[in-house]
Regions:
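Positively charged n-region of N-terminal signal peptides that target proteins for export
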Residues: 1-5
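Bacterial N-terminal signal peptides
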Residues: 7-19
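Flexible loop/hinge segments at secondary-structure junctions
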Residues: 24-343
């Protein structure tokens, strides 16, 4: 009888241990922070991945690209997200090698609130730059009316709305303006946070969209999905080939196809003001940032699996949320790149 009692005791002990093991399996939380630009699709991805893997909860704070880079560098989050690639100085200062993984593409659009003007305005890069620098101050300035014949624009003062936080959306916007206007590059420059000559600041894409929506005579810049969600007017922008192009899945994808032909190994590439017919000039990849050799191998393995899913099955969610999916050539390169992450 002793062997039977012993076996029963072992079995009973194993059963008692199951809930504890199960609880541990249910408590894998991975924290990330960064860009607001991709928040709508990241939120969708993390939710759907949790449905596939209930034991995993990915928590993401959309605090802006600058904040995401800082928190990743300080190792207070497991992954970061940015719309502007890290600088070489930031990468060098980080405690370990970091890999940039493009996730989707989007377009940054000039949004405006002009009472009684409900048409799509045309902008050149130079005109946008002069507005942002405070050199064009009225909506009926000849530089604007000359691009928009037949549109009656008022003599209303222009209020510039910009980001108050470190922002990849800002990086994309000023990167384009710096290519279109050498004077803007010299005066304002390219960074996730710049010294704005004029205007008022809002936090996140949501904050800028809210400012523009509530401020008659205003202009700002947000990711396309935020303009659509908030029902704010946005304009077309002249590309390098001289066309005035409206942001859309097709025009952003056209920009990506140009980049796909010469993608650098580290994936840090700018596609603003790309050449080509039908290309929207203020387009960009957005990136998730991961350490190549993290100390937490369990979370690393989960994030590698998540990235493989996001780069393949997850891409189908992009169009409905206003993003362009990655070109197949870029996905193939990334699936090879994630193998560098140690799990």
């Amino acid at each position: 009888m002793k062997p039977i009692r012993f076996l029963l005791a072992v079995a009973f002990g194993a059963l008692l241990a199951l809930p504890a093991a199960s609880a541990r399996a249910q408590n894998v939380q991975i924290n990330g922070a960064g860009a607001t630009f991709p928040y709508p699709i990241y939120s969708k991805w993390f939710s759907d991945y949790n449905k596939l893997h209930p034991e995993v909860l990915i928590n993401y704070q959309s605090i802006g690209s600058g904040g995401g880079i800082r928190q990743l560098s300080a190792q207070t989050v497991f992954f970061g997200a940015t719309d502007g690639p890290m600088t070489s100085e930031q990468i060098f200062a980080a405690p370990g090698p970091i890999i940039h993984l493009p996730t989707v593409l989007g377009g940054v659009v000039p949004v405006y609130n002009i009472p009684d003007v409900n048409v799509e305005l045309k902008f050149t890069g130079k005109v946008l730059a002069d507005i942002i620098m405070g050199r064009i101050t009225k909506w009926n300035d000849p530089a604007i009316t000359g691009l928009n014949s037949g549109v009656k624009l008022p003599a209303t003062d222009i209020t510039v709305c910009h980001r108050s936080d470190g922002s990849g959306t800002t990086y994309i916007f000023v990167d384009y303006l710096s290519k279109a206007s050498p004077d803007f590059k010299k005066t304002v420059g390219v960074a996730t946070a710049v010294n704005w000559p004029v205007g008022v600041g809002g936090k996140g894409n949501e904050g800028v969209a809210g400012l523009v929506k509530q401020t008659p005579g205003s202009i700002g810049y947000v990711e396309l999905i935020y303009a659509k969600q908030n029902k704010i007017s946005y304009g077309s922008v002249q590309n390098l080939d001289g066309e005035f192009v409206t942001a859309s899945l097709e025009s952003v994808t056209a920009a990506a196809q140009v980049a796909a032909k010469s993608m650098p190994k580290d994936f840090r590439v700018s596609i603003t003001n790309a050449p080509g017919k039908g290309v929207y000039p203020i387009s960009s990849f957005t990136w998730i940032l991961l350490y190549e050799s993290p100390s937490d191998k369990q979370r690393s393995k989960i994030m590698v699996d998540f990235m493989k899913w996001a780069l393949t099955d997850g891409q189908k969610f992009a169009p409905d949320l206003g993003y362009a999916p990655l070109p197949a050539e870029v996905v193939a390169l990334e699936l090879e790149a994630v193998k560098r992450i140690k799990v």
